[in-house]
Amino acid sequence: MGSVPRVLEGERYDQFALESFVKSYWEENSIYRKVKEKSSRAPRKFYFLDGPPYASAKSIHIGTAWNKVVKDVVLRFYRMTGYNVWDKPGYDTHGLPIEVKIEQSLGVRVKREIEEKVGVENFIAACKRFVDENMEAMTRQFKEIGVFMDWENPYVTYRDEYIESGWWLVKKAWEKGLLYKGYRVLHWCPRCETTLADYEVSEYRELEDPSIYVKFPVEGREGEYLLVWTTTPWTLPANAFVMAHPDMEYVKVRVGRDTLILAKARLDHVMREAGVSEYEVLEVLKGSQLEGLRYRHPLEDVVDAQRELSKWHKVVMAPEAVTPHEGSGLVHSAPGHGTIDYEIAQRIGAPVVSLVDERGFMTEAAGKYSGLYFRGEANKAIVEDLRARGALFHAATIVHRYPVCWRCKTPLLLRATTQWFVAVTRLKNQLMREAEKVEWQPGWAKTRFMNMLRELRDWVISRQRYWGIPLPVWRCSSCGYEHVVGSVEELESMGGRRPENLHRPWVDRVELKCPRCGGSMKRVPDVLDVWFDSGIAFYASLGYPRDRETWERLKPVDFIVEGHDQIRGWFFSLLRSGVIGFGETPYRRVLVHGFALDEQGREMHKSLGNYVDFEELIAKVPRDVVRFWVLQNTVWEDLRFSWKGLDLMRRDFNVIWNVYAFASIYMGLDRFDPRRTSLSSVEDSLEVEDRWILSRLASLKRRYLTAMEDLRIHDAARALRSFIIEDVSHWYLRIIRRRVWEEVDTPSKRAAYATLYKVLWEWLLMAAPLIPYTAEYLYIKVFREAEERPEESIHMLDMPEPEDHLIDSTLEEDMEKARMVLEAILSARNEAGLKLRRPVRRVIIAASNPGVEGSLRRLEGLIRLMANAKEIEFAPASALEATRIYRVEPDYGRLGPKYKRDMPKVLRLIEEKGGEIGRVLAEKGVYEGEYEGLPVKLTLEDVSLKAEYPEWLKVRDTPLGLVAVDTRLTKEEVLEGLARDIVRRIQAMRKEAGYSVEDYVEVWIQGGEDVVEAVNALKEYIKRETRALKLEVGEPPSGVEVLREWELDGEKVVIALKRAAASG
């Protein structure tokens, strides 16, 4: 049978060394593979889908580490609760962020240089090399933080088989009539020369732009103008019409010689902003009265496009575009550069003209402004021309939030462009039905997700770039027919040759035979939206459609977790793909986590100097410490990084180590065998503290299992920490030390060992998913032998079963009250300068109600023991009140006018009978009496009343009532305290000398009368507590091994030790 080994005795705790040992152990013994093999035999499946981190850097962000730790905890928990866990990690490898990095490394300034100077083939190869290097570094870091996933077989979005899976979904959308090519206004990055979907427009900067009011002349009305406001002068050359609100009131205002038309609600603001103090309102009219009013464009003679657009120059009603809270109430509309403008133009049949090219420069149709960059050059030239023509009513600047490219940070523009779309708006009802089936944690994430679906727009899936899944659309150069290819086999069946790589430029060289006219078909040059890549991961990572069996066996995904930004990102992409391809949601449960920020709540960026490098972090802080610290944070709230917080958590690990070292050393010393001494065998010997900690353990198991199943990982982490630190270390171990230190084997000691063993073993099993290195080390070094387990890893074991029958809520509540009382006692002791080693005569408890008193009486013996008190006395509050000393200070300002010449008598009365007067005032609020023939009546307004307890009584007012400590010491109590102090010094010297806990010693003590008296009176107690075979008072002989001079209560004491001959 296996007794508990004493392996932790004398071992210097070093968490870094511990984790290094475990890491090597895992690698040398292929522990992950064995854990996975064991999990694969479980009957229930758990399909986890890894939201693939973006492989754009070699060092992972703290937030990415937190993300992977959360995933790892969930996977480890489900393995240990009987699930066959699918744990394939993934990497998101395509897209512009990577292209931008490669452009920078190659010195590429503009997009066309990729083809002209670098070559697409070389560019793609550089992207792949960059991604491969980053994946290798990231994988190493994920392993460092203890993440058990199938790192030998990750899914990688750039691989050909993954690309084919993407083509399958595009084909599916085409077959369902959902794929179409359309001309729409979309956000565009002029540096990257590609479009962005709405959900990609998530980054903004505070930028300065012009803020101008422009006069548009009304046709046929000399001197009358529509006053429009814009912050984008560069869109004015593409103006098609002006928008007004039909229900708003407008005014015609005389300003100098001009008559201006603008919204009544904006009049005062506009005039104040323009510095105009004199103006006259000529007429008030409804916006609907302006409908159809024609105007002339102030720049129509210098903009070629205006020749066609001038036919549409009139006021149209657009309540959705006009607000009384900004501008002039008249909005200039350029349908080629605004989404609402575009929709209104479609409604009224107006042309949609975009006068900005792919690189952000004005086109030839912009006339005079052709070749100017839209921001800066074009804005400046247009404002100057408007001023020169007298069309500029007022010009200023505005600082506002402006969208920038999430990849290169260039300011975006809206422009009309031809793109490929998936008509997900036609699936809106189905998407919302499927989304309702998903379980979200927390609940607000679902609300946000559903609100986003209500604002659904068609999915623009095409991008004008290189490093991405090529859009599988081939167009016939003869008849214009377009065909979507869903696989390489289909490519070959249409006369194409399988390219060596499915990326550009290889796939661009593949020509197909047109099934309609026999002509030659070439692929359209676009690639797919990078969100398409990760959005198909639920089936593409399994090899579908080539491998249909795995998806059919595993579907749906049981669990996904990512940051709350992915509500409109990855979670959305997955749902769209699931409904498009399979008609149903691909996932069942979603957990959302927060962002990792710095201590001030700012995002971490190298440019801000607040970025914490992962390698730096794990060089300074052990991995399990990092894990346990981040896991304490509420999962869906933002995490504020803190070196101090990590340092405090590191101290907790010292406590955890000491708890297990204590158990290992003393159980090993007494050769405790948990297989022989089961809890049931010592049930009759369990003390109240044993039953309490077992109840707390059972409560912990229930709370832990519920929290983990509900994905409230932070609750599980906090419960584990609180239990081992507060319940076990700070309370239970303090109580049972006296039982463990007994020299003889007693039923009480065996009961304490059996209880502590169960507590520490089951806590370790629950903690294993969260602190895998520490749990593995303690399992290998202590519990595997004690448990006689064949499993090589704790992560191959099962979670402990719930034991709700052990929960004693009454006892737990009683003990909580006892702990509160003890805190009050310790506080009172501290005030009196009485260390816990010094016994006190009595503790008086005046409970706030009979229920509290009942709880404390049930644990009276334990309170007396822990408080080191001779007696616990329960008394009413009035008993303590009776000990109070009242001091009365006269208020001369009140009493002087009241008693005048008799004031000296009143003062003598207060001096002589102040205590009595104070007590009466405290009880009744008024004192009445006679002194030297003078009737005296005093109230609380006449005096200042102070009530104090006597110096020897230290009182604490708690929610449970009053707790008082009688600090008067008898001679016996002083000697007991001295004896305890001597024991503590001897134990410190034993440790300093490196003695084993089982070594016996010989002790010599020199000191004053009290010390000598304490040693003689309590010699057997001191010998028992210090394992001393010999204890003598007097000068130590030569040959002692350690000698120290101490000061106890101001008295010098010399203590000398040497190992006794019986120590072996």
From Swiss-Prot:
Gene3D superfamilies: HUPs (3.40.50.620), Isoleucyl-tRNA Synthetase, Domain 1 (1.10.730.10), Valyl/Leucyl/Isoleucyl-tRNA synthetase, editing domain (3.90.740.10)
Known catalytic reactions: tRNA(Ile) + L-isoleucine + ATP = L-isoleucyl-tRNA(Ile) + AMP + diphosphate
Record localization: Cytoplasm
Cofactor(s) recorded in Swiss-Prot or TrEMBL: Zn(2+)
Gene Ontology terms: cellular component: cytoplasm
UniProt keyword Nucleotide-binding present: yes
HAMAP family listed in its UniProt record: Ile_tRNA_synth_type2
Biological role stated in the UniProt entry: Catalyzes the attachment of isoleucine to tRNA(Ile). As IleRS can inadvertently accommodate and process structurally similar amino acids such as valine, to avoid such errors it has two additional distinct tRNA(Ile)-dependent editing activities. One activity is designated as 'pretransfer' editing and involves the hydrolysis of activated Val-AMP. The other activity is designated 'posttransfer' editing and involves deacylation of mischarged Val-tRNA(Ile).
Written domain comment of the UniProt record: IleRS has two distinct active sites: one for aminoacylation and one for editing. The misactivated valine is translocated from the active site to the editing site, which sterically excludes the correctly activated isoleucine. The single editing site contains two valyl binding pockets, one specific for each substrate (Val-AMP or Val-tRNA(Ile)).
Entry protein name: Isoleucine--tRNA ligase
